[in-house]
Each structure stands twice: as C-alpha cells, then as structure tokens.
C-alpha cells in the first residue's frame, strides 16, 4: 500500500465534500487536527481556514450548481446541521424562493460568527433528515409543509408536483401532501 501524505488524504476528503474538510473529518481518519492549521499557514493557496474547525481546499473547484456554498453553510453550523425549508426547495429548483439566504437547522446553539446569508434555527427534535447531493437536508416533503405560510399556495403546489415527477416524493408522502395542501 502506498503511503499518502496528510495533504493527499485531506484532498481526498475535500473532493468528496465540495472542497471542505473539518478538523473532525481529519481526526476520524488519523490526521491530527493541528495539521490542517499548519497546511493552511504553510501552503498558502492550497488550504484556507474558513471558520473554526473548517477548511477549504482551494485546489478543488467550486461546484457550478452552487452546492459548495450550501455545503459550507451546513458545515459552518456544525455536526448534525442540515438545510431546511426554502433552501431544500431551492436546492432542487422546485420553486422560486429567495436564494440570498441559506436556511440551516442545527441541534447546537448558534455560532456567533456565521455570515449574514446563513439563517440558523434550532433543529426540531425527531426531524427526518436525509441527504441530497451529499448535503444533509430536511426531506422535500417536510420542506414543502414548512413553506406553507411562506410560499403562495399555487407556487407550492407546483413545487410539490414537480418534486413528485422528479421522484423526490414517495407515493405515501404524496397522499399526505394532497390531503394537507388540498390538491
């Protein structure tokens, strides 16, 4: 087996995470957390400290769909965090929603240093979480229900129908949506 440098190992993680590496990710695969800080300091332009415990590998290109920014928002909020509501609909291009903000739910208290485009809320106990495109997310069905008072009914119905056509909503979930949204 070929020996990999810490840099190579961290790049592998970053390639799977839209260019991002957390100190926790590094620790889990045997890279001492201090190595990230050393690489960020020493190797200018390769690894950049984004926030506490979060680094970006600058050799990994930004995702052209904008998913890198969404992944960063979730990672900044910490483990167990996920996108919800309008951000889930925006991720799938299901409805015209405000892309200026990324809505993230977190089980932990807010970090004071979050950028203003990240809107953090307390995660609901027992929330059903999944992953879309490798990004932790509320289910599309629950995002539709959450957006009932934020998006006009006709646009929300259109989003639900589009999600169903794309296979993002299961048949049993669709029955619940039809009943709840009176479709």
Where do the protein language model's features map onto the residues?
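Short glycine-centered helix-capping/turn motifs at secondary-structure transition points
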Residues: 43-45, 93, 167
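Short, hydrophobic/amphipathic alpha-helical patches that form generic packing surfaces
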Residues: 72-76, 86-91, 139-149
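Short polybasic/polar patches that bind polyanions
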Residues: 27, 90, 164-165
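Short beta-edge/loop segments at beta->alpha junctions of small alpha/beta modules
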Residues: 1-80, 112-117, 174-175, 180-183
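Hydrophobic alpha-helical interaction segments
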Residues: 97, 101-104, 108-111, 120-183
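Short helix-loop-helix/strand-helix junction enriched in hydrophobic and basic residues
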Residues: 76-103, 107-108
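Generic recognition of short, well-ordered alpha-helical interface segments
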Residues: 34, 65, 80-83, 139, ...
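Short acidic (Asp/Glu) patches
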Residues: 67-72, 89, 122-128
């Amino acid at each position: 087996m070929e020996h990999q440098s810490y840099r190579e190992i961290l790049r592998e993680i970053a390639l799977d995470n839209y260019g991002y590496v957390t100190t926790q990710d590094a620790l889990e695969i045997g890279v001492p957390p201090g190595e990230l800080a050393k690489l960020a300091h020493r190797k200018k332009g390769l690894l950049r400290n984004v926030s506490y415990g979060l680094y970006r590998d600058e050799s990994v290109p930004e995702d052209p769909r904008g998913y890198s920014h969404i992944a960063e928002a979730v990672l900044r909020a910490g483990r167990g965090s996920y996108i919800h509501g309008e951000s889930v609909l925006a991720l799938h291009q299901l409805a015209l929603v405000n892309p200026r903000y990324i809505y993230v739910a977190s089980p932990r208290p807010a970090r004071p240093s979050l950028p203003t485009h990240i809107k953090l809320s307390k995660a609901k106990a027992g929330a059903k979480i999944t992953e879309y495109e490798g990004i932790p997310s509320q289910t599309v069905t629950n995002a539709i229900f959450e957006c009932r008072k934020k998006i006009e009914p006709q646009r929300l119905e259109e989003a639900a129908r589009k999600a169903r056509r794309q296979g993002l909503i299961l048949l049993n979930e669709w029955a619940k949506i039809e009943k709840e949204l009176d479709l």
